[in-house]
Regions:
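Core catalytic lobe of class I
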Residues: 1-175
C-alpha cells in the first residue's frame, strides 16, 4: 500500500523516529538561517466601520537568535543532521535549504556528517530580483542555497519531472 508507506513528518524531533532508522528515502529540511532576528506574523482584524482601516496585530512567530550566536546555532544543527543521516536508507538523500547567513558553515558540517564524497550538488533557489538601481550601491542577496547529499556514494536516484514553462516564465528567465 503506497499510501501506508509514505509519511510526512513536520516539526522538531518527532517521536518514534527510531522506528524509521534506515528507512527514509528523502529528507528535506528548511531550518532557521541564523539571521539573528525575531519574526512576527501579522493578523488583520476587520475595522469597526467602513471608514476605519483594518487593525493589524503582530504576533510572535519564532526566534532565530542563539545564546552564543552562530556557535549555538551550529551546536543545535549538528546532532539533528547526525540523526537524519541515521534515518536515511541506503539510497537516501537529504536536501538542506539555507541562506547566506550560515550556508558556508552548514556545508562544512554536512561534509563532516555525510562525507564530502556524498555531496551531489548545490542548488540555487532564486528568490527575488532585488533593487539593481545605481542608488543601491551593493550586490543584492537574491537566492538561497539547497545542499544535496546522498547517504552513500555511487547510489543515485533521479525521477525526471518536466513541466513546460509558461510564456511569462520564459520571458522572465530568458537568460
Amino acid at each position: 500500500n503506497l499510501l501506508a508507506m509514505q509519511a510526512l513528518l513536520a516539526g522538531d524531533e518527532a517521536t518514534g523516529l527510531s522506528s524509521l532508522r534506515g528507512k527514509v528515502d528523502l529528507i528535506y529540511i528548511d531550518p532557521p538561517f541564523d539571521s539573528k532576528a525575531d519574526y512576527r506574523t501579522k493578523i488583520n482584524l476587520p475595522g469597526v466601520d467602513i471608514e476605519q482601516k483594518p487593525t493589524v496585530i503582530e504576533q510572535f512567530a519564532y526566534s532565530d537568535t542563539w545564546q552564543d550566536g552562530t556557535v549555538s546555532y551550529l551546536k543545535m544543527l549538528y546532532p539533528r543532521l547526525v540523526l537524519m543521516r541515521e534515518l536515511l536508507s541506503e539510497k537516501g538523500r537529504i536536501y538542506v535549504h539555507i541562506d547566506w547567513h550560515i550556508g558556508a558553515y552548514v556545508k562544512v558540517i554536512m561534509d563532516d556528517v555525510l562525507g564530502k564524497e556524498n555531496f551531489k550538488n548545490e542548488i540555487i533557489w532564486k528568490s527575488a530580483v532585488g533593487d539593481t538601481s545605481n542608488k543601491n550601491k551593493k550586490y543584492i542577496k537574491s537566492h538561497d542555497t539547497i545542499f544535496f547529499y546522498n547517504k552513500i556514494q555511487g547510489i543515485q536516484v533521479w525521477n525526471d519531472i518536466f513541466q513546460e514553462y509558461s510564456e511569462k516564465n520564459k520571458n522572465a528567465y530568458r537568460y
